[in-house]
């Protein structure tokens, strides 16, 4: 007797009874069962075992044998395969292996295939209980946002409030740190960023896209009228019509134009979650369809990636410092923290919320001094106190050179590091001392450049040279955001690492950090970050190969289209037909030297743009170019898949309404980006992994991004390939199972409670301090899998990722770049920024330097506009005559000379365009400098898009599209020259320019 055959027959025979029993006890399952009428055939390939099932709106009739015309066929190669794949629990490694080797096949109507596979999956998942009942009749769910985890309270199908998570006695103990005779323990709460607490308001925004829409003068079978994009109205259409138009257009583009005709574009970030994130569901969709990839530049790491990296490596961190062990080292050893273009109280370490604020208070309590080098007296400076040096924007490198001059002149540098751990110092020293060019980089020399008095520069150099100093650069203290994003960002980042090298980078109390990073959380507990690609199956453009692809078996996906275009140059690609870019690829320092060109040989130019996610008009330099691009006849079809009617959505031909993360299932960990930011959880006081519950049903007819992609793929015959038969909840379970969570908490308990706190590292096994190993000449002892083994020039774990294995004051990698680039030479030289105060005629026309740093109250554009609660914050927008205007901060002297009053409407303009803002007159800026955060979600031109003043607040209309250096795509978009005047009501770019 063939036991396996009998077992398979019994399973197939029992299946209708199992469905019926489940339907009897689960109204949700019964409703799903009643959706379809179809015949499903399950069989072996040779037909020796076969059974078919006739589903009729809830009724099931099952018969032995083959049906003459089934709607769906599930066919197994043999009995062994069938038994393995139908016996719970499902082993996805076996499922994927069988599918890839054609041992199992699903054939028939894609929509019915999806329904049947989900019916089988729901036998288990429809019994899962989620959330916790509250005394007031609400249910408490959890969510993970870009700024941290939330409790979400839902009653009668609506979100009534959100709140931070307060940990209980059931959660692990919190770590304690001892420093200088004191003990410090962080509060047992998850302190999120302000924008996280605004999420409820944007879920119910009046600007939500609730129905599929088509531009009224767009006819996919006739006149498309691209010139009217941005001004035409829209009409509501059904999902079937919308999906039919999009899927047919995808096929038409491929058939008429060939590979590369479809481009897939997205913002830097979107909604949180390992399943729904752009590197996950969207990446899988793009690979499934075949698209020209619009490649991001390292837009928050620019100077570090294109510059600092070449001195010491860390390419897998895009040139930024790691920060391991930095908190304890700083509290115990540091005497001074220099916040150089670093405002962590505004940018929250990117994802870390306000977790680090109390740590900066600890430093203050311990008497650690603070100095702030920033054109703006930032919220961090106001919070921590200390000396403020209001440097002229773009001239930071000059100040850094003068510090090094004093250190050399007065022997205030770490000779041990310079002589034993570095190369090229003599050549660098000759430049600093003026032997190379005849210009000694004295404090007096820098005063003319920076506006910092020579006596203060010299005093800073001496103070720094005699103390143990932590240098905080950018958002998280180790290189991310800040001055690396302006015209001299490459110089600045290179200067910062050379400052650190001269002071003995890695010795006790000397490192990068602003107390945002380096907490003693357990970093070895595995949970995949969003950078690992989620469900994408993409191995090259994500960090999936590191852990995720092995830990969570799923189908590999590959994009067969070799064409890419740099995001910053997408308008030029469309309008001019050509673009050149350089790779964002972290595996080595040299890959960035390799150019790529659009159009790629053998590929079509772009004729269809599929845009996913939130607005980018407020985050990309010279963004008015995009308005012109969207109206080009070269783009035959523009699809926008988004949540709100904002930014680029208004230029689309077809709008597909996506729901928020509160309306779908997902799973994610706070501040865990993994592939793009290894161990960023070390900026948190507690590692928190959350089930992202589907708190409410999608509003209107909106759908999850995953469901939209799946629905399109069904129409292309690729639905089962895209989904692997899984819903978002199924995928979340697979992510859970791939992690270390099952060793500590059951899936059912995790679903109910909604989160898990990873126990902290024991004091005895806390991670080592970053670069200590290098300073002391030991093998590397940090828990990061890079450089890659071949990246070492000495034995594995010995030395840095450079040719010499040492810190290189004159990088060999840049020496090998031939011919030498004058704006990125191997021997770094100070040059004035092209958007600086010495720009000649341009500076006379536009005499104010405008800073546009990362947003404080919104995560990029995600929480801005659209009726968000943060609009009511007086430091974010100002309501004038019923409209919420973006804020530009202007120095008191500049405002007085121009007759501008506090909160008066002003026009900020240059030859690229104009933006109408509300003026905030302040004494926190020096004369000649203005400040306005980037990342407005609203783009509201008063007239023709791209050629009229914007009242939405897109300050990046004014920023230059010029790269920091030739041979890079290093954006210089955080600094520009403008003029500011009282708003006169002009409505065209020509009038504004005049």
Regions found by a protein language model. Give the residues of each.
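Short acidic-glycine loop/turn motifs at beta-strand connectors
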Residues: 46, 54-59, 153-159, 384, ...
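Acidic, Ser/Thr-rich peripheral helices and adjacent loops at domain boundaries
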Residues: 391, 526-537, 655-681, 922, ...
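Feature captures hydrophobic
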Residues: 1-127
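Long, contiguous, secondary-structure-rich segments that constitute the structural scaffold
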Residues: 182-194, 689-760, 861-994
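Extended redox/cofactor-interaction regions of prokaryotic respiratory oxidoreductases
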Residues: 278-373, 398-401, 497-650, 660, ...
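N-terminal export/assembly segments and adjacent metallocofactor-ligating motifs
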Residues: 126-412, 538-542, 547, 552, ...
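N-terminal leader/propeptide and maturation segments of large enzyme subunits in energy/redox metabolism
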Residues: 197-241, 245, 259, 273, ...
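Glycine/threonine-rich phosphate-binding loop and adjacent beta-strand/alpha-helix elements that clamp
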Residues: 662-698, 713, 810
């Amino acid at each position: 007797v063939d036991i396996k055959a009998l077992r398979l027959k019994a399973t197939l025979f029992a299946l209708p009874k199992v469905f019926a029993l489940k339907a009897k006890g689960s109204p949700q399952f019964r409703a799903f069962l009643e959706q379809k009428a179809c015949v499903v055939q399950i069989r072996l390939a040779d037909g020796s075992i076969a059974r078919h099932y006739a589903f009729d709106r809830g009724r099931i009739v099952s018969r032995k044998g083959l049906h003459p015309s089934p709607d769906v066929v599930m066919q197994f190669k043999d009995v062994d395969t069938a038994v393995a794949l139908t016996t719970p629990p499902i082993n996805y490694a076996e499922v994927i292996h069988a599918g890839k080797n054609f041992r199992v096949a699903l054939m028939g109507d894609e929509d019915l295939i999806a329904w049947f596979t989900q019916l089988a999956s729901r036998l288990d998942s429809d019994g899962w209980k989620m959330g916790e009942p509250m005394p007031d009749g609400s249910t408490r769910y959890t969510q993970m946002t870009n700024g941290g985890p939330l409790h979400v309270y839902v009653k009668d199908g609506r979100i009534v409030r959100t709140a931070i998570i307060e940990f209980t006695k059931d959660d692990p103990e919190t770590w304690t740190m001892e420093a200088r005779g004191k003990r410090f323990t962080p509060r047992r709460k998850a302190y999120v960023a302000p924008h996280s607490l605004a999420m409820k308001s944007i879920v119910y925004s009046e600007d939500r896209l609730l129905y599929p829409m088509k531009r009224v003068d767009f006819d996919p079978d006739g006149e498309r009228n691209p010139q009217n994009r941005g001004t035409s109205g829209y009409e509501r259409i059904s999902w079937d019509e919308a999906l039919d138009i999009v899927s047919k257009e995808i096929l038409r583009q491929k058939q008429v134009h060939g590979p590369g005709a479809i481009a897939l574009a997205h913002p830097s970030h979107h909604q949180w979650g390992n399943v729904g994130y752009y590197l996950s569901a969207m990446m899988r969709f793009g690979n499934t369809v075949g698209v020209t990839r619009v490649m991001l530049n390292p837009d928050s790491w620019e100077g570090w990636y294109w510059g600092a990296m070449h001195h010491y490596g860390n390419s897998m961190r895009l040139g930024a410092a790691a920060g391991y062990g930095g908190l304890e080292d700083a509290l115990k050893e540091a005497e001074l923290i220099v916040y150089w273009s670093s405002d962590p109280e505004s940018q929250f370490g990117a994802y870390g919320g306000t977790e680090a604020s109390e740590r900066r208070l600890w430093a203050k309590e311990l008497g650690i001094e603070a100095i702030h080098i920033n054109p703006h007296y930032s919220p961090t400076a106001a919070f921590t106190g200390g000396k403020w040096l209001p440097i002229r924007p773009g001239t930071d490198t000059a100040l850094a050179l003068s510090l090094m001059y004093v250190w050399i002149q007065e022997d205030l540098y770490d000779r041990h590091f310079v002589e034993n751990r570095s190369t090229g110092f003599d050549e660098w020293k000759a430049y600093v001392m003026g032997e190379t060019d005849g210009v000694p980089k004295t404090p007096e020399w820098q005063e003319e450049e920076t506006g910092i008095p020579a006596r203060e520069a010299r005093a800073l150099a001496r103070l720094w040279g005699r103390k143990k100093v932590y240098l905080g650069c950018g958002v998280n203290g180790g290189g991310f955001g800040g001055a690396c994003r302006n015209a001299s960002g490459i110089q600045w980042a290179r200067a910062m690492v050379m400052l650190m090298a001269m002071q003995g980078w890695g010795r006790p109390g000397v490192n990068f950090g602003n107390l945002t990073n380096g907490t003693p959380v357990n970093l070895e507990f595995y949970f995949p970050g969003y950078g690992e690609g989620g469900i994408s199956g993409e191995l090259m453009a994500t960090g999936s190969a590191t852990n995720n692809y092995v830990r969570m078996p799923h189908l590999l996906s590959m994009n067969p289209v070799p064409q890419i275009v740099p995001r910053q140059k997408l308008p030029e690609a469309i309008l001019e037909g050509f673009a050149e870019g350089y790779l964002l690829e972290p595996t080595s320092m040299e890959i960035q030297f390799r150019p790529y060109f659009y159009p790629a040989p053998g590929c079509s130019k772009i004729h269809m743009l599929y845009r996913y996610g939130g607005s980018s008009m407020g985050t990309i330099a010279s963004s008015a170019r995009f308005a012109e691009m969207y109206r080009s006849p070269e783009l035959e079809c523009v699809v926008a898949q988004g949540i709100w009617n904002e930014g680029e959505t208004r230029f689309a031909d077809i709008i597909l309404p996506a729901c928020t993360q509160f309306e779908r299932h997902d799973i994610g960990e706070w501040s865990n980006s993994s592939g793009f930011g290894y161990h960023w959880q070390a900026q948190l006081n507690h590692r928190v992994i959350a089930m992202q519950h589907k708190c409410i049903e999608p509003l209107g007819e909106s759908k999850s991004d995953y469901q939209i992609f799946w629905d399109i793929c069904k129409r292309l015959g690729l639905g089962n390939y895209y989904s692997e038969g899984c819903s978002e909840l199924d995928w979340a379970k697979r992510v859970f199972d791939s992690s270390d969570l099952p060793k500590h908490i059951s899936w059912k308990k995790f679903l109910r409670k909604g989160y898990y706190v990873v126990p902290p590292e024991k004091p005895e096994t806390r991670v080592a301090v970053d670069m200590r190993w290098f300073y002391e000449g030991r093998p590397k002892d940090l828990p990061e899998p890079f450089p890659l083994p071949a990246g070492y020039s000495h034995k594995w774990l010995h030395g840095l990722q450079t040719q010499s294995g040492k810190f290189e004051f004159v990088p060999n990698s840049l020496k090998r770049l031939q011919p030498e680039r004058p704006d990125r030479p191997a021997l770094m030289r100070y040059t004035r920024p092209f958007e600086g105060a010495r720009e000649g005629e341009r500076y006379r026309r536009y005499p104010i330097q405008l800073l546009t740093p990362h947003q404080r109250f919104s995560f990029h554009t995600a929480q801005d506009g659209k009726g968000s609660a943060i609009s009511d914050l007086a430091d974010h927008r100002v309501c004038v005559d019923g409209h919420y205007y973006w804020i530009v901060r202007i120095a008191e002297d500049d405002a007085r000379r121009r007759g501008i009053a506090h909160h008066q409407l002003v026009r900020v303009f240059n030859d690229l365009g104009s933006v109408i803002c509300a003026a905030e007159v302040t004494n926190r800026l020096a004369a000649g400098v203005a400040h306005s955060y980037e990342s407005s979600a609203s783009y509201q031109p008063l007239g023709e898009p791209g050629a009229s003043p914007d009242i939405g607040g897109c300050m990046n209309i004014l920023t230059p599209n010029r790269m920091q250096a030739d041979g890079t795509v290093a954006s210089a978009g955080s600094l520009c020259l403008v003029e500011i005047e009282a708003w006169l009501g002009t409505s065209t770019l020509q009038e504004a320019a005049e």
